[in-house]
Amino acid sequence: MKSAEGATKKSGLLIAMGLGILGAVAVAAAPKMIRRGRRLDFDNKVVMITGGSRGLGLEIARKLLREGATVALLARDKAELRRAEEILEAFQSRVFTFECDVTDQAQVNETVARVELEVGKISVLVNNAGLIQAGPMETQTLSDYKRTMDTHFWGPLYATLAVVPGMKERNCGRIVNISSIAGLVSVPHLLPYCASKHALVGLSEGLRSELFKDNVFVTTVCPGLMRTGSHINAEFKGQNKKEFALFSMMDSLPVTSIDSAQAAGEIVEACRYGDDKLVITMQARAAEAFHALSSGFVSDMFGLVNIFLPGPGKDPKIDAVKGSQSKSSFSPSFMTKLADDASVRNNELGSN
């Protein structure tokens, strides 16, 4: 009798263990199955990309065009847009360009209406327009903070508010917000940039929760340094030549940055599956992890780094100077070659 009871208990235990293992496997597999179920085919989809005439925006456009998408590129500079059309000539029947300042809500609303009328219903919005201004805190003005907030926070919000009603009506959509690792971990000499990118991360994560019920998936992208060639058009204050040299070298070296085409590919994949968040580069993921463990320690370490960065100088330049006007013996040089080459490929040199 005892033997039979023991066998019954043993078999019950084995069944429970088996069910537990099956349950664990199901729980582990569920996210992947759900992700696969959200897969979006970009063929014949209309994608609107702000800041699409150069840099990362242009790289994302290339990737999407190869997958059959039709792209609407938005930028402020008509000449840049024209050059972008020439660069993408092989896909010209699926490339449309629109002049638009994303900091002007009326312009954004008008442009979205034009895109939907002239090109088609917008399935994907990529909020990519951005600016970078580097320099010590002492050289940054309130206008600098306002300008970056207008571009990195209000611009994406205006575009999102303009496209969301249509996406809700069709019960389908994707919104990709290009923030930065600086939107998760603040770094010295980029205060206005960091503050505005933090604001975009908060907006983007909240939008995902709000729009989930409408089958509109919002992806927050936080890249580390990328070789887009944007250092040429970045702005520098204080000792601008030293700031530019450091920035362009960090932006170029393979140990600190990633190829922009690779980054664009990762962004397109995250958009395809409606992922919640994408942090690009191993260095950026490490910074995020360390910051999560001890934000104070990371901030203090950056404080030590800041001691060795260029100061404001005896006569700080309050007016920002473009990278293309801040050249020195260090930049351009062999140490910045990869980023300099990217600036040619990604239409960053046109206005310089």
Give, region by region, the residue ranges found by the protein language model.
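Active-site helix of classical SDR
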Residues: 160, 196-199
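Substrate-binding pocket helix/loop in short-chain dehydrogenase/reductase
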Residues: 136-137, 141-146
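Residue(s) in the substrate-gating loop at a strand-loop-helix junction
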Residues: 180
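Conserved glycine-rich cofactor-binding loop
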Residues: 46, 53-54
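Conserved glycine-rich Rossmann-like NAD(P)H-binding loop of the short-chain dehydrogenase/reductase
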Residues: 67-83
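The beta1-alpha1 cofactor-binding region of Rossmann-like NAD(H)/NADP(H)-dependent oxidoreductases
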Residues: 78-80, 99-110, 142
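SDR active-site lid
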Residues: 213-284, 289-293, 299-309
